[in-house]
Design a protein with these regions (language model features):
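Local sequence-structure signature of Cys/Sec-based thiol-disulfide redox active-site neighborhoods
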Residues: 1-28
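Short alpha-helical
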Residues: 13, 39, 64
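Residues at alpha-helix termini
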Residues: 25, 47-48
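Thiol-based oxidoreductase modules, predominantly thioredoxin-like and allied folds used
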Residues: 28-41
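A general structural signal for well-ordered alpha-helical segments in protein cores
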Residues: 41, 50-53, 75
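Structural micro-motif
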Residues: 48-57, 67
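Non-catalytic, surface beta->alpha helical segment in thiol-disulfide oxidoreductase systems
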Residues: 58-83
């Protein structure tokens, strides 16, 4: 099974949607909250090239945010990850 890291904040609606989508597909993930840690948000920029949340990494590779996760679902990739 793949390792999924999900960088989120408490106030982010797209973060909630990303979590729900992963759970719907039975994909476990590690949630890393970045709301109260400016230094960690800077590290997020280094990891992904983006400041926005959610940011999702699959096996250490940044895939983007919620829109990119939905696109992977549309293409059937999420079901392959769970196999």
């Amino acid at each position: 099974m793949v390792r999924i890291e999900l960088y989120t904040t408490a106030w982010c609606g797209f973060c909630l949607r990303a979590k729900a989508l992963l759970e719907e597909h039975g994909l476990p993930y590690e949630e890393i909250r970045v709301d109260d840690d400016p230094a960690f948000r800077a590290r997020l920029l280094d990891l992904t090239g983006r400041w926005t949340v959610p940011q999702i990494l699959i096996d250490g590779e940044p895939i983007g945010g919620y829109a990119e996760l939905r696109e992977l679902e549309r293409r059937g990739v999420l079901d392959v990850l769970v196999a």
